[in-house]
From Swiss-Prot:
Organism phylogeny: Eukaryota, Metazoa, Chordata, Craniata, Vertebrata
Name of the featured protein: Ephrin type-A receptor 7
Highest taxon, organism lineage: Eukaryota
A UniProt-annotated Pfam family: SAM_1
Active-site residues, record numbering mapped to chain: D758 (proton acceptor)
Organism: Mus musculus
Amino acid sequence: MVVQTRFPSWIILCYIWLLGFAHTGEAQAAKEVLLLDSKAQQTELEWISSPPSGWEEISGLDENYTPIRTYQVCQVMEPNQNNWLRTNWISKGNAQRIFVELKFTLRDCNSLPGVLGTCKETFNLYYYETDYDTGRNIRENLYVKIDTIAADESFTQGDLGERKMKLNTEVREIGPLSKKGFYLAFQDVGACIALVSVKVYYKKCWSIVENLAVFPDTVTGSEFSSLVEVRGTCVSSAEEEAENSPRMHCSAEGEWLVPIGKCICKAGYQQKGDTCEPCGRRFYKSSSQDLQCSRCPTHSFSDREGSSRCECEDGYYRAPSDPPYVACTRPPSAPQNLIFNINQTTVSLEWSPPADNGGRNDVTYRILCKRCSWEQGECVPCGSNIGYMPQQTGLEDNYVTVMDLLAHANYTFEVEAVNGVSDLSRSQRLFAAVSITTGQAAPSQVSGVMKERVLQRSVQLSWQEPEHPNGVITEYEIKYYEKDQRERTYSTLKTKSTSASINNLKPGTVYVFQIRAVTAAGYGNYSPRLDVATLEEASGKMFEATAVSSEQNPVIIIAVVAVAGTIILVFMVFGFIIGRRHCGYSKADQEGDEELYFHFKFPGTKTYIDPETYEDPNRAVHQFAKELDASCIKIERVIGAGEFGEVCSGRLKLPGKRDVAVAIKTLKVGYTEKQRRDFLCEASIMGQFDHPNVVHLEGVVTRGKPVMIVIEFMENGALDAFLRKHDGQFTVIQLVGMLRGIAAGMRYLADMGYVHRDLAARNILVNSNLVCKVSDFGLSRVIEDDPEAVYTTTGGKIPVRWTAPEAIQYRKFTSASDVWSYGIVMWEVMSYGERPYWDMSNQDVIKAIEEGYRLPAPMDCPAGLHQLMLDCWQKDRAERPKFEQIVGILDKMIRNPSSLKTPLGTCSRPLSPLLDQSTPDFTAFCSVGEWLQAIKMERYKDNFTAAGYNSLESVARMTIDDVMSLGITLVGHQKKIMSSIQTMRAQMLHLHGTGIQV
């Protein structure tokens, strides 16, 4: 009896036919590259089956009634089945990792009768790599198993009747592959199975344009997690962004990951979608970094597509430093309204800006000087011996001073406005011109100074006329002083001859003599210094006896007349001094010993001389201030503005000396003669002072424009602003050191008889070593009768907060009123530049002071310092300390730093009432709330209550840290509250005589 081993194939075929109608084919994924698709082949597949009786190829129909080729096997009746089915050789192309998709049906073994021991529900999948087709033999041992394939769903006989479709799909991966191709093989071990379709493919990332970069087709990597980095290629007219080349990564699933880097359109092109298109006419793009094309700037054009810059129209230019987006410009027109002012051999030129600046803001001016002959009118360049102030070219201001011209000569000056494109233009120069004739010049330097005779108390000198007198010499001026005084105190003698005898000198003393000539044009330069030592007492008498005996009676008579004349002169000076005591003080009244303008000069002392006593202010400034050559001064930058002009920083380089940093005050253009006189008055005052704590005057420039006052440069500027900038950063010793320096400078001024009248922290300058120096020796100030009671100057108003009450009420300014101001300066320093009396009005300040109120101690101020402030604020000026005493007190504090740690209120003297704008004595308060309301800080009432400060005694113990812990963050409010607490604490100490523990 023959046992049937093959299950009826029509059952499976029928099921496949049903699937063809029920199953909808899937579209091929765009990221897959097919190597094999059995459904796509309508002819026989002709795969190899081993044994031939195993797998059989049958035909079916898909949903479109298109024939499809499938393989089936159903030998479930016999055990130990080994049926192989092998595909044809498959070329892998560029793939490294292959995907195999199987669609199949499988019969449920339980639905077949009599096959439970032999029926299987799985089959095996194999592959074999080879570089070529090996023929039709299947060498099973060469095949590598991929996996055992099982069905998720199997069908039964009932499914056929009910038309239930159960198609399985499985996908497996192969790789990495190293050879050119491979075979797939299917091993049946006793299942009833039909392969509906076999699809073999690999994945790749398809070409894409991203960020103007083209990324080509890229096969995925060999591993599941591998990423293939691909560098993009810029599209046409694009370039890679600097240090940011375009890259993308192709994932194992055939997807491009987030792009890195990008391409950008080149200059002259802009992006449009995934391409770069050229800029149109009249448009440009200068850089690849720009996003879009821009319209050509004014006075420029582009006549072709893809322009990276626009060309300038005729007559217009673009400077090398101008960016392409700037409009084309042209040279400026000529300056307007050129005027001149001749001062002997110096010419000042001023002009107005050009009507047309060419469309630029970098207009400067340059000066061309020509000297013209009298006869033929021919002109030649002036040469390098001419000086220009501030400079000849690159002038930013509309004025210049030309110096060192020849006397009685013809000159032509051309002033040209230039800008950044002037040198590019080939057009004719545009300038304003003026022709002038110089006048008489000052004489040149006196030479040949010789000592003719030297006695005990006199020296006779002779000299030669200047080589270039430049006119008629009206007189000679002899300046002399003791050598060890170094010009701090000097005398002058004038004569019309070329010799003179200087009398009333000290025996055995070295004197320095210098002589200069004077003409109608002005003063010449001083001659070189001549050192002469007078004879000693004994040798002088012997010499004088010899001189008398040799010259006989005429000399004796002359000596007697000279002595008599000297006595008469002394009496005249005394009379003049007494007369001035009854005439009053020209700036402001001073009392008694404060009128020290014509004191006799005793050895080692020097007296301040009021410049207003000179009929000619120019003589005063030349008497006390050194005239500087403007060419020695280099202005670097503007650092502020004064009452009469700008304040600049710069460098001063005198011949034979190293250059030094200086501050330069300039007189603005268009000044009046009174403004010039007032401006130079400060130099006449400063020139008399020589002290390390008083700002030093280097010199003045009066013979050119701009008129300048040159002083030493103080790096840290005004003291009040400096302290506010460095709030809380200094030790008490450092602050006391600053105060000591200010007091020393004021002591020096007081000893000279000078009353400052405007001492305030804003008028104290600080250098890099924290040395404080007194400054601002400016104009006369007149007190106005207005309710604010302020000084008025031509530059503005000065508040009364620093002024002593008698100076406000009676206009009495003395060193004692300066002491009051110094007390305010002390308060400013210890409070780090806080405004005295805060936001009180001037009228309230005057009223409070009259009622006996004074400023409270600043936060953390030692008691000794505050007591010194109170001493300076004594209403009776006679009870205020002198500056000499103040310096001594501060010196003791510095030598004994422990005295500066004494808390406020431990001093033996009772404190004066302390000023608070609206706070009466603390005993008038019944609660903390009333106290806060009185000082206008009631907003913090809840803060105090929440922290447990319910009594004034507890408040008096508070420190600044306690105040800050309440959540009070405004520094001004912290200081105001703390100042009031210190006031309260001081009054408690005074009332109870015992300290309050803090």
